[in-house]
Amino acid sequence: MNLRAGILLMLAATASLAHSAECVHVRVGYMDQHRPPYWLGDGDKVPNPPGASVDLIHDAVLGAGFGCEPTWVRLPIARLKVALAAGDIDMTPLGEQAYYPAEIALPRDKAGNIDLNRALHNTLVVLVRASDKLPARTNPMQYFKGKVLGAPQGNSFIQRLRDAGLTIDDGGRDLDRNIEKLKLGRIDGVVVGAVTPAHIKATLDKYQGTVVQLPQPMVNTRLWLAFNDSFYRAHPEQVEALWTWLDTNRGRLGYVMQKYRKPD
């Protein structure tokens, strides 16, 4: 090997090491069930397109300076929190809960409390049968006490609603199945996240006036991108940047959902 070739090889190796050092690999866990438009496809495969929530997390990882594509790990819903605490994955979406294991890191404010701003924000609304003719002033949190609300399996807000004294039937896997139960009279309403008005409108249009939305929202919810605590301590700069990115880009989920909207 001549001198010039040797120098070029050394430069290439140095550049490769520098690129590797800039890349923080993060394993992102999410549900292995088809929940359009947020998570698409069943099983451990990641389809193309993968879903609006996957797109959002992808944008957050790159926007926060991790320096490389995330690795996607699809797991049953019940395993995600356990896998995160065990370090089998580095990050997963996690909703509001009464207790968080010490092995899980969440964003904190200056007082050391969980940061309510650096999260994904959503508003829950209720879909009901048009034939019930509920008044526009109906307060969902009060009206549905003693009744049954349907919600898709695995949603992070379910426990919060149960803690508020509501009866939640989460046996239906997705929104369509819950609305069918509503039409059959097996439940009295369906809880759904109102990320964008267009998303709700598309759902209502599908049922041609038989299902309507109550005007008053039910409750505002938050969903954090939680990290394994050991991963956080190893890469605090990137993780903190990701949490701040979520706060700065609050409307991003509604934006990425546009490509999953079916044409009118």
Provide a role label for each language-model segment:
Residues M10-H19:
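Hydrophobic h-region of N-terminal signal peptides that target proteins for export
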Residues A21-E103:
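Extracytoplasmic small-molecule ligand-binding "clamshell" domains
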Residues M31-H34, R118-L124, D205-W243:
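Periplasmic-binding protein-like
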Residues Q33, V46-L62, V126-A164, N178-E180, ...:
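Bilobed "Venus flytrap"/periplasmic-binding protein-like clamshell domains
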Residues I57-G63, S131-L134, K145-V148, R222-Y260:
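Extended ligand-binding regions for polar small-molecule ligands
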Residues T71-V82, D169-K183:
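Short helix-initiation/N-cap motifs at beta->coil->alpha
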Residues T71-Y143, P215-M218:
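Acidic, polar ligand-binding/catalytic clefts
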Residues L94-L106, D188-V219:
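A ligand-binding cleft/hinge motif common to bilobed small-molecule-binding domains
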